[in-house]
Design a protein with these regions (language model features):
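Solvent-exposed soluble domains appended to multi-pass membrane proteins
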Residues: 2-215
Length: 215
């Protein structure tokens, strides 16, 4: 195969991979989101791309991220649960003996992630059962401070999960976030409400300020 100066650069590294709900780089500001600002302005930045509005929204975008394939508009991620998903990041990491985890700060059952994500190669956990049996699936829950908040806090998700893997020598972790979920206002969006003061002085519409606040 073709090789260049980057070939093998990250061999042996650990990987934390995120799909960010409803996210746009418009939300990144050095003063309000310094960590995100650092992430997108250092290392490798890939900006020659476009993102269509997938018919099944979050699930199709997640399917593209996790598989590198184009969805067919019929809940491709859900359907992948019965397919042979041999060429995914967790499959490659697992081949090197790395334990692969996935987390989502909503329900286990939404979009049938409790079926699709283990089929990708992840040990998948969420904060709520979503109608699944506690006896069968209760071990797949992790704890956050405000599990009933909508949208739930990505920060609390990190607090509740990092301890499961951070001391491992090797790990691959995937996060499906939810903090940036619509609607963008200060009444129906808990994340926006919690961070309202941080954006109060911005000369923007309420929707724009609420969007920045929840991200």
């Amino acid at each position: 195969t073709n090789r260049n100066e980057y070939t093998g650069m990250f061999e042996g590294y650990n990987l934390i991979f995120l799909t960010a709900e409803g996210f746009s780089t418009y939300a990144i500001r050095e003063d309000l989101t310094p960590t995100l600002y650092k992430l997108v302005n250092s290392g490798f930045v890939f900006n020659n791309y476009y993102v269509p509005l997938w018919q099944t929204s979050t699930s199709d975008g997640e399917y593209v991220n996790c598989t590198g394939l184009i969805p067919d508009g019929q809940f491709s991620m859900r359907k992948s649960a019965s397919n042979n998903m041999a060429y995914t990041l967790p499959r490659f990491f697992s081949a090197e003996g790395v334990y692969c985890r996935a987390y989502h700060n909503n329900t286990l059952s939404y979009y049938d992630r409790y079926l699709s994500h283990p089929n990708l190669g992840y040990d998948f956990k969420a904060i709520k059962l979503g109608g699944l049996s506690e006896a069968e699936w209760g071990s797949q829950l992790f704890t956050v401070e405000h599990p009933k908040a909508w949208p739930a806090s990505d920060y609390e998700m990190m607090q509740g999960t990092v301890g499961e893997y951070i001391n491992d020598d090797r790990f691959h972790v995937y996060y499906m976030t939810v903090s940036g979920h619509m609607n963008y206002n200060f009444k129906g969006n808990q994340m926006s409400a919690w961070n309202k003061d941080a954006v109060a002085d911005l000369d923007m519409t309420e929707n724009a300020r609420a969007y920045l606040a929840c991200n």
